[in-house]
């Protein structure tokens, strides 16, 4: 534990999470707030500047702290993993786009990392849960998408490239509103976010290069 310095929080006690020993004073950032029972002030969790901890890591490190309620932990950094999923249909390659209940735009299947999972394990689990698809994840394709909706929670999404052998999708109805298989040119028109377009373009280039190397006749 320690204390914050600064006009807004001067002298307020905090919980500190770090991967290395710290000096008596250091520059840190608030990474989470933990509301307490009985209307008490939320506890502040801080990490050294430049270090990022996500919810599973924060919970693991704080679970043994006596007297700290982390049942309603609110993390200011979130990490998700997913994939650009494509299918080699008879009339060309198609990419799967989904629209979530709380989203207005087309994007790719993804979800939060759970404790003990690798990035690829998270992506495979989320794909299976949201779409029912079994996929093969390609090596050497890993795209990072960072964004901060409403200027609050900083979100990072790791996207892989995955191929499925079927276009039969079984959507998770409590998560997904709708889905569509689109050609890459169609998907580029449907995706609204710059990050999603960048991820999509990188996937298309990767498949083009791999197919050219393998002599595949597929065209996207």
List each language-model region with its residue ranges.
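Unchanged
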Residues: 111-199
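Hydrophobic N-terminal alpha-helices or hydrophobic patches in metabolic proteins across all domains
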Residues: 2-76
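Charged phosphate-binding loop/patch that engages nucleotide di/tri-phosphates or the phosphate backbone
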Residues: 66-77, 189-220
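Short, well-ordered beta-strand micro-motif
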Residues: 85, 97, 159-163
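Short small-residue beta-strand/loop micro-motif enriched in glycine and branched aliphatics
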Residues: 39-41, 105-109
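Short, charged/polar surface micro-motifs in flexible loops or helix N-caps
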Residues: 8-10, 20-23, 90-91, 102-105, ...
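Conserved N-terminal beta-strand and adjoining loop/helix that marks the start
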Residues: 72-95
């Amino acid at each position: 534990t320690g204390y914050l310095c600064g006009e807004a929080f001067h002298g307020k006690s905090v919980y500190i999470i770090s991967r290395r020993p710290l000096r008596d004073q250091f520059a840190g950032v608030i990474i989470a707030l933990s509301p307490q029972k009985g209307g008490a002030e939320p506890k502040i969790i801080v990490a050294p500047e430049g270090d990022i901890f996500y919810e599973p890591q924060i919970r693991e490190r704080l679970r043994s702290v006596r007297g700290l309620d982390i049942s309603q932990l609110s993390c200011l950094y979130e990490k998700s993993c997913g994939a650009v999923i494509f299918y080699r249909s008879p009339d060309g390659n198609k990419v799967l786009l989904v629209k979530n209940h709380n989203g207005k735009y087309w994007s790719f299947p993804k979800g939060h990392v759970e404790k003990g999972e690798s990035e690829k394990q998270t992506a495979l689990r989320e794909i299976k849960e949201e779409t029912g698809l079994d996929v093969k994840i390609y090596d050497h394709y890993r795209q990072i998408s960072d964004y901060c909706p409403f200027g609050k929670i900083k979100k990072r999404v790791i996207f892989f490239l995955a191929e499925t052998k079927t276009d039969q999708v079984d959507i998770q109805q409590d998560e997904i509103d709708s889905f569509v298989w689109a050609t890459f040119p169609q998907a580029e028109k449907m995706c609204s976010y710059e990050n999603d377009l960048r991820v999509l373009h990188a996937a298309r280039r990767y498949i083009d290069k791999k197919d050219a190397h393998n002599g595949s006749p597929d065209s996207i």
